[in-house]
Amino acid sequence: MKFELQNQFVAPSIEFLKRLPLAGYQSIARTRLIKMLADKNDEIVGIQQDLIKEYAKKDDKGELIVKDNQYTFTPENETAFQKAYYELMIENGEIEKATYSHHKEDCQDFLLNADINVSGDEATCYDALCVALDVDFDKR
């Protein structure tokens, strides 16, 4: 299965999918989708760490400086970091993994028929996931 999803929705999609009450083949489809998203999330976290290493202040030994459990930045580097981080998060990430022949259709089905109330950020995440997986609400 292959689809694109904005990076900012990858981690929240995992949490959203975990909340869905599913059984049988739908649960299996969800678990495989979560694994795909988790792999993409690991990639995003790695890139975030690379950005921190590039822009955060370092001591004379080259170690990142952490103050009050936060990395420190010069004003210029903080602006550059925030810009790079924003660009990373709004980027459409390509997610692809061989699963099984009807995986996408199974995911579309459980998303279309999800019996869960959502609002706020979770609703935005649900919508992004439905768009990414081409869920057709006209079928309802």
Predicted features along the sequence, with ranges:
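N-terminal interaction modules that seed assembly of large macromolecular complexes
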Residues: K2-D60
